[in-house]
A protein has these predicted regions:
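Exposed boundary/loop context
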Residues: 2, 70, 119, 268-270, ...
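Active/binding-pocket-proximal capping segment
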Residues: 10-14, 24-29, 245, 258
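Gram-negative outer-membrane beta-barrel transporters
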Residues: 15, 164-285
Length: 285
């Protein structure tokens, strides 16, 4: 039918990482805890394996009465954005070999000294630092993909006005998530209405303050509906008024620094299982 058109497409991406990350053998002897509570091991030189990100999609356009007055259009498919490789670079730069630090709770251990070399090590052995942050990535991590569907109708009205109603829904296929693999199980809960979890300690491995780990989730979503009236003119100008409302929820708003993303994520319970919350991209009206 001339007034009904379908389109289909298939895209695929294969992110690949060279074997450039440094190995810290000491980390391989440590046990960590993933977001499901299971004990796991990591290697600092193990980056995500290459995997195919399939992105099929279909679309349609239907001129209902074949007179360009009433048009239904829409489509559905999986979409892959441009990979943000900085997420992976966190692991390359935070492995306990390149840099290290000392976190002291007792300020009398190293009192203030204006000399910047006062506490600088006299020798650097090349072995892991006495204390170091880790940024890790789950071996089966996949870059973000969303399944997005939209439907819309355009209707020509008297006086040359075009009315449009549209709805878009997106859900995570491979959404981003972070958890601290060095955070132990909560030991108790508060009493009363505020029954949040409590921790008696914040490290499984004492020399690793945090091991923020990049992983995936598939619970985030967003939707938006809009309605507009538009009056185009022959000289190329147009007048348009529109209203839209939407909602966006995810488990974390990813940033370029793994630790900062995990620490700055507002939660009310277990920080390794934050649950859905409004995204910073939540547009509302």
């Amino acid at each position: 039918r001339k007034n009904l058109k379908f389109t289909a497409g298939l895209r695929f991406d294969i992110p690949y990482f060279g074997e450039t990350a440094l190995r810290n053998p000491e980390v391989e002897t440590m046990y960590f805890r993933n977001a499901d509570g299971r004990f796991v091991n990591f290697r600092t030189d193990q980056l995500p394996e290459p995997n195919i990100l399939w992105s099929p999609r279909v679309g349609f356009n239907w001129d209902v009465f074949d007179n360009q007055k009433t048009q239904f259009r829409g489509g559905s498919g999986v979409f892959t954005g441009r990979p943000a490789y900085v997420w992976i670079s966190n692991q390359v730069g935070n492995n306990g070999i390149l840099t290290g630090f000392a976190q002291l709770d007792n300020t009398t251990t190293r009192p203030f000294n204006p000399n910047p070399d006062a506490y600088k090590p006299t020798q650097v052995s090349g072995t892991p630092a006495s204390s170091y942050e880790l940024a890790l990535t789950e071996p089966n991590f996949k870059f973000p993909q969303v399944w997005r569907t939209n439907v819309a109708v355009d209707q020509k009205l008297p006086l040359g006005i075009i009315a449009t109603a549209e709805f878009i829904y997106s859900s995570d296929v491979n959404g981003l998530a972070y958890y601290n693999a060095n955070l132990p199980v909560a030991t108790s809960q508060f009493n009363g209405p505020d029954n949040r979890y409590r921790w008696s300690g914040n490290r499984i491995n004492s020399k690793v303050p945090n091991a923020v780990t990049l992983s995936n989730q598939a619970v985030g979503y967003s939707w938006v509906g809009s309605f507009s009236l538009e009056r185009p003119f022959s000289n190329g100008l147009f007048v348009k008024g529109a209203y839209s409302y939407g909602e966006t929820k995810n488990t974390v708003d990813p940033g370029s620094i793994a630790a900062g993303t995990w620490f700055n994520n507002p939660i009310i319970s277990d920080p390794n299982n934050p649950g859905l919350g409004f995204s910073s991209n939540f547009m509302g009206h």
